[in-house]
Amino acid sequence: MQYNGTARKVGDHIDTDAIIPARFLVTTDPAQLGANCMEGLEHGWVSRVQQGDIMVGGKNFGCGSSREHAPIAILGAGMPVVVAHSFARIFYRNGFNMGLILIEIGDDADRIHDGDVLSVDVENGRITNHTTGDVISCPPLPPFMHDILDKGGLVPYVRERLAAGDA
């Protein structure tokens, strides 16, 4: 899996209420949630996002309350990948469960700036910054995570396994 897009950089400790404020939790529709993605950080933030852009976070991205709406909002805004210094653990699990690709890169997140053009090679654990020429190595995801992501998240993955008699 390779993803190409423009970096949409946010800071440290971006909580789930910044990603999708509680007032927008009246739906689970990805398009509606995506239209309000990062509204708790900056009004209209999502208007700069193009389909396929890559969110780049700082430390502890996705902290705060556990809400599946947050990764759905990011996906609904058209961003299939979040690269960050680190993730809050509950957000990390929720993200993969919803089909959002999350990659931790530690201090290398500081080498990516808003507007940089990126390629993220999930299978080989490589992020190429075409703006600066930097190549960042990261651990590739384990095969079972690829299987979950390929199916669009944990629920579709389990449904398929149950239907096939594998579970």
UniProtKB/Swiss-Prot annotation:
Key word Disulfide bond present: no
Uppermost EC category: lyase
Name of the protein this chain belongs to: 3-isopropylmalate dehydratase small subunit
TM spans (from-to): none
Organismal lineage: Bacteria, Pseudomonadati, Thermodesulfobacteriota, Desulfovibrionia, Desulfovibrionales
Record-linked InterPro entries: Aconitase/3IPM_dehydase_swvl, AconitaseA/IPMdHydase_ssu_swvl, IPMI_Swivel, LeuD, LeuD_type2/HacB/DmdB
Pathway: Amino-acid biosynthesis; L-leucine biosynthesis; L-leucine from 3-methyl-2-oxobutanoate: step 2/4
Biological role stated in the UniProt entry: Catalyzes the isomerization between 2-isopropylmalate and 3-isopropylmalate, via the formation of 2-isopropylmaleate.
EC number from the UniProt entry: 4.2.1.33
Swiss-Prot/TrEMBL keywords: Amino-acid biosynthesis, Branched-chain amino acid biosynthesis, Leucine biosynthesis, Lyase
